[in-house]
Amino acid sequence: MSFAVSLDELPKDLKLESASIYFSWLLKDVLTNLNSSLWLKWPNDFYLEGAKIGGMITNIVGDSMICGVGLNLINSPEGFKNLDIVINREKLLELYYKNIENKLSWKQVFSKYKLEFHRNQNFSTHSDNVKISLKNVELQNDGSIISNGERIYSLR
């Protein structure tokens, strides 16, 4: 699924580099309210237990934020998992778009996200083709992480 949001409609306190966290969290929020146990791995991957079930990509094109979501609803490749609840795709989209329309601030979303950030400790991410352990990184208020003194933003 993909959609576009005007940059003017984004929360004023949202750094564009952290949009993938913002939009991923809004979808995660919908799914956990429907009793899914998924969580958000920094910066934009959906996980169930230790396996990836999807992800979010954001990109600025002109004056719009383009968001693309992939989520294993029914089938998944080997080594991945499916969503742990059954939901109609149209209903999921309806609930997700309503959550986007609520226009939560970055501060509201981030305050919830940082409470679960500890779940990243056994995982890693990549920046400039370098694997970075998330075990000892420091999450910053703008959604970036500090690893070995270097600030890293989600570039997805």
Spans of model-derived segments:
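Primarily the active-site beta-strand->alpha-helix module of PP2C/PPM metal-dependent phosphatases
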Residues: 1-6
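Long, positively charged amphipathic alpha-helical accessory segments at protein N-termini or as interdomain linkers
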Residues: 7-38, 48-156
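Short loop/edge segments at beta-strand edges and connector loops
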Residues: 40-42
